[in-house]
Amino acid sequence: MLPLLLFVGSIVAPASVAAADSRPNILFCIMDDASYMHMSAYGCEWTDTPSFDRLANEGILFQNAYTPNAKCAPSRSSILTGRNSWQLEEAANHIVNFPAKFRTFPEVLRANGYQTGKTGKGWGPGLPGEIDGKPRVLIAKNYGSENLDKKPTTGMSNEDYAGNFEVFLEEIDSEEPWFFWYGSKEPHRRYEYGSGQKLGGKSIDDIKEVPGFWPDSEVIRNDMLDYGLEIEHADSHLGIMIESLEERGLLENTLIVMTSDNGMPFPRGKAQEYEYSNHMPLAMMWPKGIRNPGRTVTDMVSFVDFAPTFLDVAGIRFEDSGMQPSPGQSLMDVFRSRKIGQVNPKRDYVVIGKERHDYSRPGNQGYPIRGIVGNDYLYLYNYKIDLWPAGNPELGYLDVDGSPTKTEILELFRSGKDRSYWELSFGKRKAHEEFFDLANDPECLNNLADDERLTEVKHKMKARLDATLAEQKDPRFLGNGDVFDKYGFSQGHAWNFYENYMAGKESKKRTGWVDDSDYEPEPLD
């Protein structure tokens, strides 16, 4: 482990709210772009995450937690509202104006006596809207006064997340409950190349196997280690926060949650809908509230479950909260159970999907997908396979962040040496349906949609997905999905960016999250 990483509108409170001195504090920790399998608690051998592991060892390690949408803003929208992307109007998309009609759970906690604060990344990118002429506070007042003496690497933030949490604890009334959002900006790109070996003390040989959808090279192994170092940085700040809670005697009645918003910022990860995209790390610790700590739970958990859970532990009835209805379920039954493995047999699937992420397609189009995960299978339906799933090549595949891994795959493709990795990460889908056996193919490389032996299983999952989307009135499923492409962006230049760029009216300077070399010189279709 890198040593502390070098430094480190109101509503009426319902009658059911518990007495203030018994309501737990909540510390919600969310990384930026980390996949499920890269916490050491899950067996990763090239990252060390002792703080996450402590939550797992003294609380619950969730094996099957999923974000409904593997991109920053829409994923965080689901967390805040308890609703799936297709239930959130503009907030289904990335870089948007947050709809006024959707109350967030921190707003509800605040209205019911909770003191709230945040540090680091909250909801975004996008604009929260206004209340009484002032920016709406979707999460909480930001605590950002404390900074590290030196950035650990050129790619990391210099924010002292743990220091800002300490400032929050010093300011609040210790007799009243609180909610704090710790939004690490790591492991979001960009990384300092080679930092994983140089500062993290790791070797590229520590990585036993590179995912099959990337070439195995020294460059890519270094890219993975650099990503792992940033995960460790996020974890180290959580460790300091836990120590502070212990010193203050607050740990016993604090629910601590650690997860990530979406998968790793690599090709075929973040912004897609595969295991490396949507399957999230999740551990929770609450000494006073979780029975039989040290359990591993296999229930299917969705990010839409967070809001109902947090209101439940705070003694607030969801139906009295003023929030829009949620398909999520409180996890209090899991906390109160002593069971290992599957706790609630009804919690056996989650639904996922995506609409528009970044702005690299004609007509402001997204790449719509809906899917369902359960019983070790993943079913996906790609609505528009004539579109480029990672964004148009002539605009740099904007849905995939620039990186050494992306560059290497593009170079292999352009040189004619190997196009297979490009097809997996950037090529157009060959069929509307994708179906994967996750137990035997967690990398989602072998599409079994046409395997007759699994036809019945696939049809059952598709039927369950369709029934869920119909019940939730998904515009895409009901035939009005183009509404998602008509919603505006919170950044004016993004509207019709494709057309404006192709006409020479916009430049690559607007797309700093990719490399200039990611752009193909001409359209590929």
Name each model-derived stretch.
Residues 477-491:
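Short, charged, surface-exposed hinge/linker loops at domain edges
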Residues 5-10, 16-428, 433, 442-463, ...:
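Formylglycine-dependent sulfatase
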Residues 467, 471, 475-480:
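C-terminal structured "cap/appendage" subdomains that terminate the fold
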Residues 438-440:
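Extracellular, beta-strand-rich glycan-interacting domains
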